[in-house]
């Protein structure tokens, strides 16, 4: 039997990373999930990541970085309830260097299980807003990881050039359980429907011509 290549998926609980996980499984990778509690208000996304991993029958590690809330307090509305949540893209929703923090842990995990591949869910519309979703960033981070480990690691965002709507279409074909995914920045029973991430999700489903199986307050 040919041994399958292992890969680490940074699985946030959102639709983009869920599609990456299903894509990797479909490609024949032996998939390992990795998700984070970084002190975010929307802690529900961690539970969603766990459910997606269960659907895929893959292992998942939940890393407690909740003390990062002490660093991000006063900086981002994703961890600080005293900062107003915006409905459009603006500085308060940025968590500084978040992907780099997550990818650093993913590199350590990859080395520990002899995995060469790390994938995360940055997609086409992210790059214009988030520096740590850009190809230049993760290519550079890949080189740093190689220098720091002496291993030929590969870090990739497979859909970094693909609009979110097209990612959702692919996910539907792959059988992604979008009803289990979470996008909202708040920790409510349903998506709030008003935060930037909810609006982004709503627009992507509308553009894809597909129906979002989750419910929103608005």
Task: Give residue ranges: language-model regions.
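Glycine-rich nucleotide phosphate-binding loop and flanking beta-alpha elements
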Residues: 126, 205-206
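Local cysteine-cluster metal-coordination motifs and their immediate loop/turn environment
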Residues: 104, 180-203
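ATP-dependent adenylation/nucleotidyltransferase module used to activate substrates
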Residues: 1-175
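Charged, low-complexity, helix-prone segments enriched in Lys/Glu/Asp/Gln
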Residues: 98-99, 201-205
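Short amphipathic alpha-helical interaction/hinge segments
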Residues: 149, 206-209
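Short cysteine/histidine-rich metal-coordination sites, predominantly Zn2+-binding motifs
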Residues: 187-188, 209-218
